[in-house]
């Protein structure tokens, strides 16, 4: 009967073959994507944890985390959110200090910054702003504080475009200025940032790189370190609050003294 209906048989055969191949591809795609992501994370030394502090993070915080059992390495990160005008609109850009050994960028075009007035921008920034490599960009503060409180300058020359491992899709996260959404990021040399405080601390857990990302073993390894770091929170917050309060009180006392001296 098959020989009498070769065309029909072959049609059914190839339909089944195509369906089986498609199903097998779908089933294996997730695993392949996870393996590729894990390899990429290892290549760029992606962080396992990120610590944030609303009042800023200090070298003491860095030292405490570094001494925590299960921590392989810690890195202090500096960032600042700024505004960039595009015609009649503006976009929020997160400026990030380049940090050796963690979250390494992949240069898509151009090169890495070599001077304080050079900048490596998000590929998305070039598309949205219409800027090109070699152009100069000027940023403004989105708060009452001048940009000079955070950076050595406000105008930079674009020397390249790049991607970052923790921005895997088009979403760049939420911000505290502008419309509340970050449109793109840009990378600067660490010495371009003037503050002694860190806005972020990146943590790599001991043994995490040997585990496959997204696996239960990886999650358990990182979770154990996270729990120990969270135990430092109360003491770190109290220490930072006291330091900020003391600094503020000293400024008030100095101002009062100046007023008293002027009245004499």
What are these regions (language model features)?
Residues 1-24:
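N-terminal Sec/SRP start-transfer signal
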Residues 19-26, 30, 241:
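Alpha-helical transmembrane segments
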Residues 31-264:
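Basic-flanked hydrophobic alpha-helices used for secretion and membrane insertion
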